[in-house]
Amino acid sequence: ACLVGSEMCIRDREELKAVQALLPLINRMIYLKTDEEIELMREANQLVGKTLGEVAKHIVPGVSTLQLDKIAEEFIRDNGAVPAFLGYGGFPNSICASVNDQVVHGIPSSKMILKEGDVISVDCGTILNGFVGDSAYTFCVGEVAPEVKKLLKATKDSLYLGIQCAVEGHRLGDISNAIQTYCESQGYSVVRELVGHGIGRKMHEEPEVPNYGRRGCGPLLRNGMCICIEPMINMGSKNVAFEKDGWTVRTKDRKPSAHFEHCIAIRPDGPQILSSFKFLEEVLGENAI
């Protein structure tokens, strides 16, 4: 068998048997992307950024999370892409919309109406030119309590601290430890059950990217690795509960949670952020975190 990127060419039945025996190992492989593939991933991720910017225009009191989902899906399709989340593992919508104590994977609903003082994490993905883009941002709905806004800022800051550690030759645990150390120093807790991930032609590839861990541990960061770093940080306890819908994750103590995510590539000259908050921050202006 010839392994070229993420594609295999099987020549005969004996080779097929050999590959089948290796599948458990292959599924744990970290695929390094070429320069051309990274540029295609950048395009998919930039579209995610533009979609979040479009959604940001409509995050106001009185709007439902289902309305936001429809806006995102229409924008993605109008730009020649496919919503990556829609149908993924049976997920019914194009964005995850997680409000207040919902950590991640909130299912958009006509019954979930945003109100003044809420916060909402919008996680969005696209498939464009055969590659997946994935990014998330936690928005304020109107005026938000100062202590909640502080949580959001700390979570976003921890994302960039993690990205700073995403250097070729370092270890994955350096990223994880930077996020954990900073957030816990601010009095917040790090969710354990949910992690970031590798990304490419599939939304979830190896390696897993925890937001906690030890420096110097984990896979070696190599040129061409593409990963999603996504701190999920709670104001109270780190403990979470999974809702009966099979998707939504909440904080057990019902205190607020925040979630920010960038897709990055490991490069010889340092980490490159493939996704973007620029478009939504242009919409939010002074209200951006």
Give the positions of each predicted feature.
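Single conserved hydrophobic/aromatic residue that forms the stacking wall/gate
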Residues: 1-12
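Intrinsically disordered, low-complexity regions of eukaryotic proteins
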Residues: 9, 16-17, 136, 232
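Intrinsically disordered, low-complexity peptide-like regions
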Residues: 10, 24-25
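Generic extreme N-terminus detector
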Residues: 12-13, 33
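Intrinsically disordered, low-complexity polyampholyte segments enriched for Lys and acidic residues
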Residues: 14-17, 27
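Active-site neighborhoods and metal-handling regions in enzymes and metal-associated proteins
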Residues: 25-289
